[in-house]
Amino acid sequence: MTATAQQLEFLKQNIKTIPDYPKPGILFRDVTSLLEKPDAYALSIELLAARYRAAGITKVVGTEARGFLFGAPVALALGVGFVPVRKPGKLPRATLAESYALEYGTDTLEIHQDAIDANDRVLMVDDLLATGGTIEATTRLIRRLGGVVHDAAFIIDLPALGGEARLEAMNINCYSLVSFDGH
């Protein structure tokens, strides 16, 4: 199934825009409003899964927390394992950590050391691509474990924030179902 313009517009219409959240001047794209509509949520999962069904994906990685909401069902639809990437101290087995820069300070993500096998073909899934920092750190974790990143897939892209260019500089192909102008 290839996404039609009508399907993508349907998804876009089911993502609410909240002005001045979390601070003045920001237009927050609320993907949780899409989750409230079973037909829109199911369509988003099916469109992502359909795109990657023949790609030889062996693992889907989702980043905390909304990446879990889309990554796990995509993994299930593809018949492959799902691997969560989380904030420090949230995973019970031995982990690998990767820190990355934020606008003010740093953050860290962790993955189980045994979650990705050498040469696993990995699809990363998250709800939104903004600056790309989270997915850049996730890519470094996957590569440190020997995995091969096939693509990074998102529900929403905010092109003005430069995330896709940042990830393409790391040889990461990006795919988003919808994009919104602004930030």
From Swiss-Prot:
Keywords, comma-separated and alphabetical: Cytoplasm, Glycosyltransferase, Purine salvage, Transferase
EC numbers for this chain: 2.4.2.7
Superkingdom of the organism of origin: Bacteria
The protein's enzyme class: transferase
PROSITE patterns: PUR_PYR_PR_TRANSFER (PS00103)
One cellular component (GO) term of this entry: cytoplasm
Pfam family, one: Pribosyltran
GO biological process: adenine salvage; AMP salvage; purine ribonucleoside salvage
UniProt pathway annotation: Purine metabolism; AMP biosynthesis via salvage pathway; AMP from adenine: step 1/1
Function (record text): Catalyzes a salvage reaction resulting in the formation of AMP, that is energically less costly than de novo synthesis.
Subunit structure: Homodimer.
Name listed for the protein in its UniProt record: Adenine phosphoribosyltransferase
Organism: Edwardsiella ictaluri (strain 93-146)
Gene it is expressed from: apt
